[in-house]
Amino acid sequence: MKVSVLITLAVLGVMFVWASAAELEQSGSDQKDSPAWLKSMERIFQSEERECRKMFGGCSKHEDCCAHLACKRTFNYCAWDGSFSK
């Protein structure tokens, strides 16, 4: 009984290693494409950063924040400036 359990565990271990190696080999081609994907995502986030920052968005000056928001110097985030006008 102990021998059959050990053989079963050994076979499962070999199958796991074999499946992991096959998956690694298959995903190797995906890793070559990932820098282009990361660059496109970076462009998306950079374009959003050029617009005004919404509530609790990071900022360095008041002009970074949207209307009715001001840059709070304590933690550098956009917060309501207390105004109600349009």
Swiss-Prot record:
Protein name, per record: U13-theraphotoxin-Cg1b
Coiled coil (residue ranges): none
Function: Probable ion channel inhibitor.
Entry's free-text remark on domains: The presence of a 'disulfide through disulfide knot' structurally defines this protein as a knottin.
Pfam families: Toxin_12
GO CC, alphabetical: extracellular region
Key words, A-Z: Disulfide bond, Ion channel impairing toxin, Knottin, Secreted, Signal, Toxin
Family: Belongs to the neurotoxin 10 (Hwtx-1) family. 41 (Jztx-36) subfamily.
Single GO term (MF): toxin activity
InterPro entries from the UniProt entry: Huwentoxin-1 (IPR011696)
Tissue and organ expression note: Expressed by the venom gland.
Propeptide residue range(s): 22-51
Disulfide cross-links: C52-C66, C59-C71, C65-C78
Signal peptide feature range: 1-21
Localisation: Secreted
